[in-house]
Every structure is written in C-alpha cells, then in structure tokens.
C-alpha cells in the first residue's frame, strides 16, 4: 500500500487544500457570522485491484466529495437550515429589502406628510384666498363708508355755509309789502312832516293797520332817500333824530 494513501486513511482530516475543497463554499464567512459549518462527507476511495499501477488512483475522488458538500447534496433538514441560515454573509443587497421596507413605511408617512402639507397648504390657500378677498372687500367697504361720510359732512358744511348767506339775504329781503293806499297815506304824511312824534306814529299805525316799527322804519328809509336826492335838511342841533328822542322819552315806546 502506498504510504501517502495510508497516511490519508489514518488522518481524519485531509490536507489543507483538500479540506478547503471539502468545506462549504461559503464557509469562509462562518467565522464572521458565527454559524456552524456542516461536517464534510466521508471520502470515497476507488478500490482497484491494481492499486500501485497508477499514482493517481490512490487519491480519493475529490470532485464527488466537493459536490456532496453543496446544499443540493445535503439531507432535507440540513438543506432547509442552510436555506434559512446561509453561512456566508450576503452582499449588501441582502439588507436592501429591509432598508427598502423601512424606507417605504417612512416614505409613506413622509409622502403623506408632504401630501398633507400640500393639502394643508392648498386648504390654506383655498380658505385664505376668500378670507383675504373678504378682508380686502371689508377694507374697501370701510374706506368707501369713510369717504361717503366725509362727502356728506363736506356737503352738509357747504350747504350750511351756503344757507347762511341765503338766510341772511332772506332776512334782508323780508320787507313789508305796503299797499298803494298805505304808501299814499305815508307819502302824504311825509310831505307834511319829515319826523313823526310818538303819538302821530301810533295814530298812523292804527289807521293803516301797521305796526309802529314798520311806520318808523319806512320814515327812516324815506328820509335817507330824500337826503340822497335833494340834499335834505340839516341835522338837528342835538344830532339826534326827533323820532328817536320822542320814542325814548315816551314810556309806551317799544
């Protein structure tokens, strides 16, 4: 028997290259992941009669042993375990579904929050638009009311200012409408006497159905007119109208 074959039979573990081939292809990651690796399958030697004939016949068929270590060659229970717990850590894509799943729910609320933000913004815009319009309309209405009130005040002030001269002119225009008979009697009396006594003024007022004031005012106006036309008489030495003195002296004056 070949010494190399006997040493291989005596040792439970094959040489380093043989042991690396028999191990799981993903066994390098077992050290990092901490998962146990499956024991290698026993060697299968080809028993030949002419063993020393060829040197290669003494070595086992490593291809079969390496294929036996694959998950497809393992028993069903071990295959399920390897499928559930792979020995070699997967690529970063293995974490992608989890991160994607985490991102998806996060993106859902984020998207929802964005949608809610946009919807809230939309609601604010839709509700704020008419609110602003109402505020603008209210301000314009207040401005129009203020302007109208100012215009009313100005118009009322103008009317009052206009009404005052009109009232004064009306008061001035309110003159006694003497009849022809009254004017005839007054002219005849003025031709005889430019100044009237208190008693004579009272008699004329009673006869013509006038007041003493009306008679007095008429005679004053008539004297002013006569002075403008004729030059009139000189003023009395006392510098006072005789009617005024008479009326002031009489107790029955106005």
UniProtKB/Swiss-Prot annotation:
<dbReference type="GO" id="GO:0061056">
    <property type="term" value="P:sclerotome development"/>
</dbReference>
<dbReference type="GO" id="GO:0005737">
    <property type="term" value="C:cytoplasm"/>
</dbReference>
<keyword id="KW-0371">Homeobox</keyword>
<dbReference type="GO" id="GO:0043565">
    <property type="term" value="F:sequence-specific DNA binding"/>
</dbReference>
<protein>
    <recommendedName>
        <fullName>Homeobox protein MOX-1</fullName>
    </recommendedName>
</protein>
<keyword id="KW-0805">Transcription regulation</keyword>
<dbReference type="GO" id="GO:0061053">
    <property type="term" value="P:somite development"/>
</dbReference>
<feature type="compositionally biased region" description="Basic and acidic residues">
    <location>
        <begin position="154"/>
        <end position="178"/>
    </location>
</feature>
<keyword id="KW-0963">Cytoplasm</keyword>
<keyword id="KW-0678">Repressor</keyword>
<feature type="DNA-binding region" description="Homeobox">
    <location>
        <begin position="171"/>
        <end position="230"/>
    </location>
</feature>
<keyword id="KW-0539">Nucleus</keyword>
<dbReference type="InterPro" id="IPR020479">
    <property type="entry name" value="HD_metazoa"/>
</dbReference>
<dbReference type="InterPro" id="IPR042634">
    <property type="entry name" value="MOX-1/MOX-2"/>
</dbReference>
<dbReference type="GO" id="GO:0000978">
    <property type="term" value="F:RNA polymerase II cis-regulatory region sequence-specific DNA binding"/>
</dbReference>
<dbReference type="GO" id="GO:0003700">
    <property type="term" value="F:DNA-binding transcription factor activity"/>
</dbReference>
<dbReference type="GO" id="GO:0005634">
    <property type="term" value="C:nucleus"/>
</dbReference>
<keyword id="KW-0804">Transcription</keyword>
<dbReference type="InterPro" id="IPR009057">
    <property type="entry name" value="Homeodomain-like_sf"/>
</dbReference>
<dbReference type="InterPro" id="IPR017970">
    <property type="entry name" value="Homeobox_CS"/>
</dbReference>
<keyword id="KW-0010">Activator</keyword>
<feature type="region of interest" description="Disordered">
    <location>
        <begin position="87"/>
        <end position="178"/>
    </location>
</feature>
<dbReference type="GO" id="GO:0045944">
    <property type="term" value="P:positive regulation of transcription by RNA polymerase II"/>
</dbReference>
<dbReference type="GO" id="GO:0060218">
    <property type="term" value="P:hematopoietic stem cell differentiation"/>
</dbReference>
<dbReference type="InterPro" id="IPR001356">
    <property type="entry name" value="HD"/>
</dbReference>
<dbReference type="GO" id="GO:0000981">
    <property type="term" value="F:DNA-binding transcription factor activity, RNA polymerase II-specific"/>
</dbReference>
<keyword id="KW-0217">Developmental protein</keyword>
<dbReference type="Pfam" id="PF00046">
    <property type="entry name" value="Homeodomain"/>
</dbReference>
<feature type="region of interest" description="Disordered">
    <location>
        <begin position="227"/>
        <end position="254"/>
    </location>
</feature>
<comment type="function">
    <text>Mesodermal transcription factor that plays a key role in somitogenesis and is specifically required for sclerotome development. Required for maintenance of the sclerotome polarity and formation of the cranio-cervical joints. Binds specifically to the promoter of target genes and regulates their expression. Activates expression of NKX3-2 in the sclerotome. Activates expression of CDKN1A and CDKN2A in endothelial cells, acting as a regulator of vascular cell proliferation. While it activates CDKN1A in a DNA-dependent manner, it activates CDKN2A in a DNA-independent manner.</text>
</comment>
<keyword id="KW-0238">DNA-binding</keyword>
